[in-house]
Amino acid sequence: MAALREAAARGVRVRVLVDGMNARLNLQGSAALQELAAAENDEVRLYNPVDLLRPGEINYRMHDKYILVDGSLCLLGGRNTNDRFLSRTGQAENDDRDVLVYAPQPDEHCAVRQLENYFAAVWSLEETRPVTGRDSGGTALLERYAALRSGWPEAFEPVDWSGATTPVDGVTLLHNPVGAENKTPELWDALVHLMEQGGDVLVQTPYLICSSAMYDDLRALGGGRELAFVTNSVEGGANLFGCADYLGQKEKILGCGVEVYETLCGHSLHTKAVLVGDRLSVIGSFNMDMRSAYLDTELMLVIDSPEINAQLRGVIADYQASSRLVRPDGTQTEGTAYVYVPLPAGKRALYGVLRYLVRPIRHLL
């Protein structure tokens, strides 16, 4: 928030979209948010703010995460904006992945331009409401920015974006419908169509929570190509409900003809990526679950680049080495860097209960 406040003070137009549920849980009464919303050149809006008179709409969340700058640069991925995801290197509780797109001369088909149009569509929704800030004359955010700049000057050095990025053959934005309502699974369907194009598909996702229709798609995909998922092991995953559901659904998942790498790497995986063949890489916010398919706003960026694909396969290979590979026939192989950590008895008992309790609400996990 300090960086956004400082940008506005320099005359930059700043617009911030915040998920309404996240704002209720984490930003209620936030002096920093009030200072930001009250500042000249700053606007803050909430997507589907919590209304206890409309409890049926609480579950529609804004789950995508991105930053747009000057119509030529965007950063997009699965990383939430809090300390669990933005701590110093090696201290974050979750492993995540983002992709930066630099387009100094964007045309109307450019992914950055597509993301601008997407932002405008969400910003103008009836269910997106402005935050009215209180101007108390406070300067806490500007003071925080000055302290950050003094303490970490290397983070503020100019960046040669052309030199820091890799030329690619194409980038395309995929997204869900934007309204706060039950959604047709447009993004899931698009991902399935992409996966159908490759003979070797590798998916990294925090959890696998599928509907009957999603299982049908996985069976069709698993029957005609190599399809593997890299996901959290129940010993290392941070989402208790997702891990409990996996235990209850594991046999059904493997029955789709897919391989599963159960990763135990010291951190909980929060990355969302799909690699199709040796060219396509898809990165964004979409979890392989029903909430991402049917309820939330989601974004995925499709990158056509053998070089990026190879880089990502190399990174994911490290996670595979720290995994327990489970095959469709139930046989298992431990990776070269896999270190077994026993599941505590208390956690095992909790999973045993939760795997049954979550069944009626799997679509909300």
Write out the residue ranges for each language-model feature.
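Charged, low-complexity intrinsically disordered terminal segments
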Residues: 1-43, 49-63, 69-365
